[in-house]
Amino acid sequence: NLGLVQGTMPAFIIIIARVWLKEQINLIQLFGVLITFFAVLIVVSSGDFYSLRDLQLNKGDVVMICACTLYAVYAVGLRKKPKIGALALLTFFSYVAFLGSIPGLFYEIYTDHLILPGLKGIIILGVIIIFPSFLAQIFFMKGVEKIGPARSGLYTNLVPVFSFILAVFFLNELFQMYHLISLALIFFGIYLFENKRQKVK
């Protein structure tokens, strides 16, 4: 369900950008967004759409929908950020997140649920800190600054596809034809969105 809900994030971003920033979107661009979402469906279902019938909404899905909505607000809000660099802004967010996590840390210590990572855990944490938490956020901020939230949001649908590609190299999973089809559809959807935008300009 996670990948399916995450696939709706570009739609959330476009809706919020339309309301907040008055960004225009036409039917061709909307069709491009739908194509990228269809590509996510292919990946989530492993090419078998009948498997989607077994999906059921649960509390985790509601939490994920809230997360996607809030991240969409964040993505659109980046266009209204102060005139400071991406690194300075990310540093500020990091300090806020650090302070916000302190009560949870004390709670885990108090309830004797604190688990310290071993060597493997430290390595994994290092990878998470450097790549998704730092570099990815910097690149996303720069992307929103350059091309806007609506266009940047479309690229988030590449996440499940690239996740599978990385799994092929690091987890020895098989690369299937539906991965290639999904990747092609996402780029086609982005092309439609971008091409129509250029013609309008």
Regions found by a protein language model. Give the residues of each.
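Hydrophobic transmembrane alpha-helices of multi-pass small-molecule transport proteins
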Residues: I25-G47, N157, L166, Y178-R197
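Cytoplasmic-side transmembrane-helix entry/capping segments in multi-pass membrane proteins
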Residues: I25-F37, D61, I84-S94, G148
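Hydrophobic alpha-helical transmembrane segments of multi-pass membrane transport proteins
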Residues: I42, V62-G77, I102-R151, F162-A167, ...
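Signature of the 12-TM Major Facilitator Superfamily
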Residues: N1-L4, L27-L30, A88-F92, I124, ...
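Hydrophobic/aromatic residues within transmembrane alpha-helices
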Residues: V19-L21, I25, K81, L89, ...
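Transmembrane alpha-helical segments that form core, pore/gating elements
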Residues: I13-I15, V19, F49-T111, F139
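Specific alpha-helical transmembrane segments that line the substrate/conduction pathway
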Residues: N1-Q24, P149-V168
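Short alpha-helical transmembrane interface motifs in multi-pass membrane proteins
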Residues: N1, F31-G32, Q56-V63, K120-L125
